[in-house]
């Protein structure tokens, strides 16, 4: 496999030679807009991780509302959530309706939504208040943007993993990419993660030398973007935290086996604290 090539190395070296020290660069307009939109979403969306109250496996059923419930909700009468044959229903004094995965509905001053795999559906509950801290980023580094091919997976198939939001999904092994970083070439596993009913993204969940010292200890996600001609872009400036970095309501993905970069990847989202205690560094998923 031809290793990934940094698309900005030549211009970066030229800048050093002609202009002296290189100053921190502002992110490209598209990235700046995406970060601003994400900040707005965290601050205002009803299903923002900063508004999370609980996320639990529905199992044989969940009781919501009263203080002794599985999920106590102030001011909410007793409701029950159940799953049967992959379908989730909400039953209460004035409501009897299905919960469609990925579509939050109001319950008093709260929002609830269902997600996850059939037979293992989970219920997420969001409240009116925001807790925790928003997103913070390293200065933009054009030297951590790479492009190149993706090799086929060593073992094609599917594997169950926790996605960005801590919900179990069935991901497809998409392949591997090789990145020259920190003086060595690192091979990273890529998986296709479902993001909606008919949507998916190529994702890499990785650890690096900043974990626990600038970034979330468990690792970060970054999306691999298809380009023309069978190539892909990997931009570590777009690395982002799993939702468990924002709230302890979310379970935390275990690091993917082999996806560890010894060097410090000082790009993308930082960690400001306040999330779930991360899985031990030695604990890896398949």
Question: Which residue ranges define each predicted feature?
Answer:
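Sec/Tat signal peptide C-region and signal peptidase I cleavage site
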Residues: 20-24
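N-terminal cleavable signal peptides for secretion/export
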Residues: 25-70
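Mid-length scaffold segments of soluble, non-membrane domains
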Residues: 169-215
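Bacterial N-terminal signal peptides
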Residues: 7-19
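Surface-exposed beta-loop interaction hotspot
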Residues: 115-171
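C-terminal boundary/linker segments immediately following FHA domains
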Residues: 91-140, 271-273, 277-278
């Amino acid at each position: 496999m031809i290793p990934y090539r940094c698309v900005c190395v030549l211009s970066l070296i030229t800048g050093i030679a002609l202009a002296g020290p290189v100053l921190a660069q502002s992110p490209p307009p598209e990235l700046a807009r995406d970060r601003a939109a994400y900040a707005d979403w965290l601050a205002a969306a009803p299903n923002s991780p900063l508004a999370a109250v609980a996320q639990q496996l529905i199992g044989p059923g969940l009781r919501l509302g009263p203080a002794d419930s599985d999920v106590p909700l102030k001011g909410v009468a007793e409701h029950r959530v159940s799953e049967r044959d992959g379908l989730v229903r909400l039953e209460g004094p004035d409501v009897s309706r299905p919960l469609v995965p990925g579509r939050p509905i109001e319950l008093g001053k709260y929002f609830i939504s269902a997600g996850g795999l059939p037979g293992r559906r989970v219920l997420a509950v969001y409240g009116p208040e925001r807790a925790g801290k928003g997103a913070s980023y390293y200065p933009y580094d054009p030297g951590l943007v790479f492009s190149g091919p993706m090799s086929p997976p060593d073992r094609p198939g599917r594997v169950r993993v926790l996605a960005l939001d801590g919900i179990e999904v069935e991901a497809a092994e998409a392949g591997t990419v090789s990145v020259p970083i920190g003086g060595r070439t690192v091979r990273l596993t890529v998986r296709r993660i479902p993001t909606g009913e008919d949507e998916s993204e190529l994702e890499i969940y990785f650890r690096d030398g900043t974990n626990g010292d600038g970034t979330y200890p468990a690792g970060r996600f970054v999306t691999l973007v298809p380009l023309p001609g069978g190539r892909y872009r990997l931009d570590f400036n777009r690395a982002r935290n799993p939702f468990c970095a924002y709230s302890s309501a979310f379970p935390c993905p275990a690091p993917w086996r082999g996806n560890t970069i010894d060097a410090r990847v000082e790009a993308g989202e930082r960690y400001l604290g306040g999330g779930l205690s991360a899985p031990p560094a030695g604990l890896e998923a398949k």
